[in-house]
Amino acid sequence: SDLLIKSNQRQYHITLFVCGFLTSHHPNFDDDFEIKTLNHQIELLQQLRLEPFELEMTQIDSFSSALFLHIHDQNNILGKIRKQLAQSSTEIAAVDYCPHITLGLYSDTWASDLVLQRIQKLPRKNMKIQVNQLTFGYYKAQILQGLLYPYHQIQLG
C-alpha cells in the first residue's frame, strides 16, 4: 500500500461501460454523453430483467497505473450488460474489457518487477460478491480518484 496514492476517496466498484461525460446539450466533444442516450440505456437494461447475480474477486494484479482485483463472471452477466449498453452508445474506453476493482492508483512510476514481486507475496483468497443493483454514476474529472456519485440506480430482481 506504500506504492499507492494515499488520498484515494473513490468507492470500490466495477466499471461496466464508460459512456463519457453526461450533458443535457447536444454533444460537442467525443466524450459527451447525452441524457437521452442514458435514458435509452436504462430502458435497454430494464429489458434484460436481471436477477441479482454473483461475481468472484480473484487475484490481485497490476495495470501500469493501478493495482486491481480481477473479477470472474462465470455466467457472463457483465458481458450481456455491456452488449446491451453498446446498442445505444459507443464506449470511450480501452478496446479490451477487463472486469476489475481498482484498489488504488500508483503514487509514482514503479518498476514492474517490484510490483509483481510484492503481489506474489500476498496470500490468495477468492471472495464472492452479490450484485443487487446497477448504478449509472459520475465523478468530477478534476479530482484525481475523487468520489463517485450515483445518477440512477436499477435494482435487480
Predicted ranges, named:
Residues 1-157:
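Histidine-dependent nucleotide/RNA phosphoesterase domain, centered on the 2H-phosphoesterase fold
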